[in-house]
Every structure is written in C-alpha cells, then in structure tokens.
Amino acid sequence: MKKQTLLLLRGAILLLLCSAAGYALYQHVAGGRNEQAGTVLQQQALNFRLSTLEGGDIELKKLRGKAVLVNFWGTFCTPCKEEMPVMQKAYDRFKGDGFEIIAVNVRESKGAVKRFVERHGLTFPVALDQSAEVYRSWEIYYLPTSIFINREGRPERMYVGGMSERQVDMWIEDLLSGS
C-alpha cells in the first residue's frame, strides 16, 4: 500500500512539473501577448537585396521614405498561412499611403512559393531568401516574424508569431503617423 501511494505521489509531482514546463513554454512562444505588445527596436535596419518572385530585385534601402513591414514566413508554417489574408488586407488598405510590405520567404523553392502566392491571391512583393542569409543576418529565429520599419529606415517593432488584423492595422497606422 505504501509503495502504491509513493508511486502515485511521484506520478502527480511529475505531472505537475510537466504541466508547469508546458505552460512556461506556451507563454514564451505563443502566449502572454496583448494587442499592444511587440519588441520595440531602435537601430537602423540592415539593408538587403533579394530576388522577387516576379524575377526582379527588391532592396530595402530603396524604400526609404515609406513605412515598411518586412514579414519573414514559410509556406509550411501554419501561423504564416493564417496571417497572409491579414497581410493582403493591410496591403490593399495602406499601399497608397506610403506603405509597403515585403514578404521574405525563407529557404523554399520558387515554384512552391509561386503556387502558394497564386492560391492565396497575394499581390504584395514576395522576396526569396533561399539561402536564409537575410534571415540569419537579421537574427530571426521563428516564423512568422514581422518587423515594422519607419520612413527613416529604423525598425520600430518586431513581432514573433501570427498577428491579428487589429495589430497589423494599429502598428501600420502608428508608422504612418510617425508616432
């Protein structure tokens, strides 16, 4: 009887520890964020030049004077797939207001990215970081990651994970208003 009680107690403690570790991981990766959250950044954005899905090039520094949302994503990434309609709505809404989106796909073939873009009706610029050079130099660790860059070329916010339409619109409006 004592052995059974001890075994049950050990099992309960193990379950409690696993639950606490799981909750801590969830809070770190996906939870604990409110609509206002996001890492605030100060330094100048690192320039990059990447090929686009259409065959041209896009260079970040040439967009100076515009508010820019750089979104690192992948076709395999569920939160990335879920936020693409949000990105398209934001692009449609703000593109005439001195705003641009660069969706930087990381390490996927041009064909896979093109199929994804066509299937989802995306019209904003899609850049291909097939070697993940920009991804690494910007010290991005998770997909999706979005960086909001002001008109002077300084990143103001970085958000890791999928974003709501409300968040995207609010942060773009902040960039455009200069606040």
What are these model-predicted stretches?
Residues 48, 58, 72-76, 116, ...:
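Conserved hydrophobic/aromatic "anchor" residues
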Residues 64, 72-89:
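Conserved redox-active cysteine motifs that mediate thiol-disulfide chemistry
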Residues 64-66, 96, 122-123, 140:
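Active-site acidic short loop of glycosyltransferases
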Residues 81-120, 130-137:
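Structural microenvironment flanking redox-active thiols in thiol-disulfide oxidoreductases
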Residues 1-47, 171, 179:
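N-terminal targeting signals for export/organelle localization
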Residues 69-70, 101:
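Hydrophobic beta-strand anchors of alpha/beta hydrolase catalytic cores
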Residues 47-68, 91:
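A short beta-strand-turn-helix
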Residues 115-123, 128-179:
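Thiol/disulfide oxidoreductase modules built on the thioredoxin-like
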